Swiss-Prot record:
Pfam families: NusB (PF01029). It comes from the Bacteria. Keywords: RNA-binding, Transcription, Transcription antitermination, Transcription regulation. One of its GO terms (molecular function) is RNA binding. Belongs to the NusB family. This is Transcription antitermination protein NusB. PANTHER family: ANTITERMINATION NUSB DOMAIN-CONTAINING PROTEIN, N UTILIZATION SUBSTANCE PROTEIN B-RELATED. The keyword RNA-binding applies. Involved in transcription antitermination. Required for transcription of ribosomal RNA (rRNA) genes. Binds specifically to the boxA antiterminator sequence of the ribosomal RNA (rrn) operons. HAMAP family: NusB. One of its GO terms (cellular component) is cytosol. The gene is nusB. GO terms for biological process: DNA-templated transcription termination; transcription antitermination.
Amino acid sequence: MSKVSGGGPCSRRRDGVDPALRSRARRRALQAVYAWQISGGVAKQVIAHFAHEQAYEVADLVYFEDLVEGVLTHCAELDEKLTPYLDRTIEEVDAIERAVLRLGAYELLYRQDVPYRVVINEAIMTAKRFGSKYGHTYVNGVLDRAALALRKVEVLG
């Protein structure tokens, strides 16, 4: 019997993407981005540390590396894109929610292969799991408005 989640053949989409593995990659990417935000470490070291741990947890390692490298490389741009939808400065946003928002903004901008609804839903679920009690509602509001600006055709289409 095939596994329905976590890497079984039945869980893959037609394009070969396994949503469960991508979700795990996002959770690990959140941890890596959070660690980078707190420590200010070098991007390659953060990725190497978490990629090593990633090998022990079944996940989409390529997607994990793309997310982390993308957020760390484009952080200033992502913050700029998020700023109009924040009610405070990005630095004042809780560190977990800040990492989730940056990951979501990266996917909205640079991962057009991922539907905006998937980006927002994954961000909400990640914020619920790791963030503050109501952090997921904040993440939802910010990314929902950002998606309208960044992917207007897809959102309104």
